[in-house]
Amino acid sequence: MDLSLFFAGTAGSVPSARRGLPAVLVRRGGDRLLFDCGEGTQRQLLRSVGLLDLDSVFITHFHADHWLGLPGMLKSFALRERSEPLTVYGPPGLHELMDAMRIIYGRLPYELDIVELAPTDTVPRDGYLVAAIPVRHKANAAFGYALVEDPRPGHLDPQLAARLGVTPGPDFGRLQRGETVDGVKPEQVMGPTREGRKLVISGDSAPCEALAIAAHEADVLVHEATFTHEEAERARLTQHSTARQAAELARAADVRLLALTHVSSRYAGGELRDEARAVFPATEALRDFDTIHVPFPERGRATLERWSERLSRERAQAGGQDAAPAPDASGGRDTPRAAGDPAPRSGEAHPAAEPVASP
């Protein structure tokens, strides 16, 4: 089953010409989960993958850069005649916030469920769960989130099953689903249970133990990196993280890929990536519209697919939506580059990008 993270916005606190405010779209099979919804998120989605029918929205905390795009998106869903229910999850205080928004989005033709989570609450889904993680940030309540898949059955040994008298074909499938076939039990012919995939999204946070524990052996840790280490004192005062701190947490948690986001407008992104890679080499600094694809562990590591005008055109032709320009189509101090890429001249677009495997 496909699992990916699409980054609709990677800026920190305020948008820039090439970065939108925080929003991460997680796609797992047919499920669509949005984590945070900063101002302009729906337009970022329209410019890229389209305004999808979301299943759920998870808000990390109530600083405006993480939720201000939500009332407009709810209204747009109404104007598009959405009929499917939508659930919004968030920390304590979410009901009060949504009540205040109601004057903006008005009456909706679809059911809107508001669920306040307590620290360490879990939201069960089909084949996985989403867990709230209490993090350290200057907000009344702030969460990160972990998406954790259910364990998967081990591999079937077809030769052993056949020797025990099981006929190849549908009966093999029954064994894999946990059924006993002709007296043969699944545990007789199935290998060890395999772990599912894990994604962790920090939201805004200073380094904290709860996040490190939740991120243990995660396939992808999406961690904020608002500052470089030169601004460590400012990070401490505002309860944000430096790129080095994010990398130290990733190394301690033994994650497979660290993805840096929530980038201050003072940085291009490359300096954050380089600072983190000095501690934890498997690090990427994200740009708007990047996608991380997460295969099952036995099929390899997560890979980063950079957005490009070529990808935008191809997806627009396939989906019938207007093509969107790459968000970093011009040079400047806010335009990050892949490792080793030369800086683009003013007005020069980055070359079309192919999927890049993490180190």
For each predicted feature, which ranges?
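Conserved beta-strand hairpin/beta-sheet module of binuclear metal-dependent hydrolase folds
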Residues: 1-50, 83-85, 144-147, 154, ...
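Active-site metal-binding motif and surrounding structural segment of the metallo-beta-lactamase
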Residues: 39-89, 113-116
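Active-site-proximal loop/helix segment associated with metal-binding centers of metalloenzymes
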Residues: 15-17, 126-214, 220-222
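Metal-dependent catalytic neighborhoods of phosphoester/phosphodiester hydrolases
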Residues: 69-77, 101, 268-277
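Binuclear metal-ion centers of metallo-dependent hydrolases, dominated by the metallo-beta-lactamase
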Residues: 119-120, 208-331, 337, 341, ...
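General small-molecule cofactor/ligand-binding pocket signal
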Residues: 6, 89, 113-118, 131-133, ...
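Active-site neighborhood of divalent metal-dependent phosphoester bond hydrolases
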Residues: 79-116, 266
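Active-site neighborhood of phospho(di)ester-bond hydrolases with catalytic His/Asp-centered motifs
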Residues: 35-38, 54-62, 91, 200-205, ...
